[in-house]
Amino acid sequence: MPMSGRVRIPDGISSELASAAGCALRTVVHGFDRLGRLTDLETVVIQGAGPLGLFSLAAAIRAGAGRTILIGAPAKRLDVARRWGADHVLNIDEARDPQRRLERILDLTDGLGPDVVIEVSGGATAFPEGLDMIRRGGRYLVIGQVSGESVSMKPSVFTQKHIQVIGVLLGAVEHYYKALAFLSANRERFAFDEMLTNRYRLDQINLALTAMQRFDEVKPVVIPEVG
């Protein structure tokens, strides 16, 4: 509906998925709009395995990335990433040392590093880690940094490696429209419902938040009703 700030949910898309698209996928779509074209010669590393990370994986695959690597935890989320088509996953619960993760990524990219890194973990220390792993001339899409926490880094890395850094927060109604269209066009390619985990009543919302903090949930669904 032009000029209204409202979009129509496509047939076959549940209210739960449409809600997820209104935040996580809308942000990813905005980020990919700003990131630009991907080619089948490029490797994309995604830092984070939550809704932003899984949507970024799907978007990178559909955008034509040659290879995708997802870093995150817990194992159940990485299993979803594998089923969706990630070429490699790296479990941070099994590789807690950043240097070990860097070495693994370099091994997978012939020592060059990835062409594109997408930060969606929300962890401040992920940012300098991404800068370390990205190849010369690479692009770094930063979506997850909202905490305001400070980290140590060397600004010279931007000039020495010719890195382009792109920051994105949320998106406009046009990105929500594109997000819903993405769900509709790719619902048979990716089992998006795998992200929607347990359902909670409104009076159980604190239970849902606690479960998310424990990483027991990917995207819990809160139903606007009470017991």
Language-model features: locations:
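C-terminal substrate-binding/catalytic core of Rossmann-like NAD(P)-dependent dehydrogenases/reductases
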Residues: P98-L106, V146-T197, L207, D216
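Hydrophobic/small residue at the entry helix of a nucleotide-binding pocket
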Residues: T27, L52, A60
